[in-house]
Amino acid sequence: MSFYESVFIIRQDVSLNDIDKIVDDFAKIIKDNNGTIVKKEYWGLRTLAYKIGNNKKGHYYFLGLDITGNVKEELERKMKLNENIIRFLTIKADSISSEPSQILKNQSTENTPVIDVTINN
């Protein structure tokens, strides 16, 4: 198994409940294939650098994963098929840090509430 970091952007008009369902679907795929979500972070509704379709903002979500390459391919296939996901990027990592990401640290200094941070060791 290898470590991967995946960030995906969900359309601005999707509710938090629907975002949770999307992440739960990914978690099920990972669990069914003996992988684990090491870390997950909701980065919030953020302004996009440029307009994507009709979206000027998007919900950003980060997953730190311990999975095989086949599971990565399946997750990316599901992300491509999900019309609510407007962009995603998955990269291989040497390890997954137990520290909150720099984006969450910046949000904490701005007094922005953090909705979900989970670290599984």
Curated annotation (Swiss-Prot):
Q: Which GO terms describe its cellular component?
A: cytoplasm; ribonucleoprotein complex; ribosome
Highest taxon above the source species: Bacteria
Matches recorded under Pfam families:
Ribosomal_S6
Q: Name one GO molecular function term.
A: small ribosomal subunit rRNA binding
Q: Which InterPro entries match?
A: Ribosomal_bS6, Ribosomal_bS6_sf, Ribosomal_S6_plastid/chlpt, Transl_elong_EF1B/ribsomal_bS6
Alphabetically, which GO biological process terms does the record hold? translation
Give the keywords, sorted: Ribonucleoprotein, Ribosomal protein, RNA-binding, rRNA-binding
What SUPFAM superfamilies does the record point to? Ribosomal protein S6
NCBIfam families, from UniProt?
S6
Q: Which PANTHER family match?
A: MITOCHONDRIAL 28S RIBOSOMAL PROTEIN S6, SMALL RIBOSOMAL SUBUNIT PROTEIN BS6M
What does this gene product do? Answer: Binds together with bS18 to 16S ribosomal RNA.
Question: According to its UniProt record, which protein family does this protein belong to?
Answer: Belongs to the bacterial ribosomal protein bS6 family.
- Its protein name is Small ribosomal subunit protein bS6
